[in-house]
Amino acid sequence: MSERAPVVTIDGPSGAGKGTISQLLAQHLGWQLLDSGAIYRVLALAAIHHDVELENEESITLLAAHLDVKFLTGNDKDPVQVILEGEDVTTDIRTQECSNAASKVAAFPRVREALLRRQRAFRTAPGLIADGRDMGTVVFPTAPAKLYLTASAEERAQRRYNQLQDKGFDVNIERLLSEIIERDERDMNRPVAPLVPAEDAFVIDTSGKGIDEVLELALKYINEKLSSAN
């Protein structure tokens, strides 16, 4: 890992626009991209592919330490393209089987430690955009620029509703809103790495804002921070 390679962390709750803004920033700056929210799913899928028992902490930890994963800028449908061992698994990691397996492997402390090191290894020249929930507080606490994107639960539910409708799913917006509120409560009050802005994070409320406006605010902040750091 190069400590001199700059890193911009982007944290916040689901539906706040982290994925889209991370993709656009990575494209604009020509930097590496890390989607930390997908990494446990990727590890779970790798375990399934290699017939590794999900209950075997030692084997899963070894797999985590050598996980061959890349995150590329994607498209409007999937802002981040996930590549595992040279194969596009963007859709594969979203299955219920993969989700269930991810919950199992994430329960192992040694696996979490191995993936923490693996995530930090993404910090290479020319720079890194790190998208997640604890990037600025746990994974890259010394990052020179930290963003925290948020939005009202109602707006995030509407965005998620629109996304699922576009993909042909029949969804109930009231249920989505309830799930988002419950997840926020759980994430913000968990004892380990709770979802909170870093003390030195620049908070952007994306409610009622278009992508271009949020991107402009983010770039202005990042340029100011990186200029003062040099």
Curated annotation (Swiss-Prot):
It is found in: Cytoplasm. It comes from the Bacteria. GO terms for biological process: nucleobase-containing small molecule interconversion; pyrimidine nucleotide metabolic process. Its main location: cytoplasm. Its EC number is 2.7.4.25. ATP binds at G12, P13, S14, G15, A16, G17, K18, G19, T20. GO terms for molecular function: ATP binding; CMP kinase activity; dCMP kinase activity. It holds the Pfam family Cytidylate_kin. GO terms for cellular component: cytosol. It catalyses: CMP + ATP = CDP + ADP; dCMP + ATP = dCDP + ADP. Keywords: ATP-binding, Cytoplasm, Kinase, Nucleotide-binding, Transferase. Belongs to the cytidylate kinase family. Type 1 subfamily. This is Cytidylate kinase. It comes from Shewanella putrefaciens (strain CN-32 / ATCC BAA-453). The lineage of its organism: Bacteria, Pseudomonadati, Pseudomonadota, Gammaproteobacteria, Alteromonadales.
